[in-house]
Amino acid sequence: MYKRQRYFRSNLIKVSGDYLQNKNPDATILGYDQWQWLEQELNKDFDFLIIFSSIQILAEDHEYEKWSNFPLERDKLLNLIDNYKDNTLLFSGDRHRAGIYKKNNLFEITASSMNKPGSSFVETDKYLIGKTYPQENFVFMEVFEKTIYVGIKDMYGNTLNSISLNY
């Protein structure tokens, strides 16, 4: 684990309630030291790697805070993952809704909130598998010898969406 993502992050650009992309090459989410640390960690041997982010990495189409607000940083992260790790799973939150996203062979599970549901509007995204769930939810993960089963459950423990990953 390392320092919080927001500690080094450049300012977001906001217009009329929407966050816009910051394409400034000096804009950062992690800062230089955290990027160096992350690349060193990705060079290590893992059977399976899980990366946690407070904000969504794959999602692009909503108006809220996400890695794609900093497209150069997002591309840098996705390229690092692509260059170093085949078996990677992303977890994120801070959306007050849950969803499973997939870009190429990379999956992201977003889950929140356990106690404060989001609005009921229908959200779409080109990387979204199925739909998002604005009700209270949580993520579950079961790890077996060569398979990880991960998904989203509602507050009653019912599975809303899930995926199975072999590694």
Regions inferred by a protein language model and the residue ranges of each:
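Metal-dependent phosphoester/phosphodiester hydrolase catalytic core
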Residues: 3-167
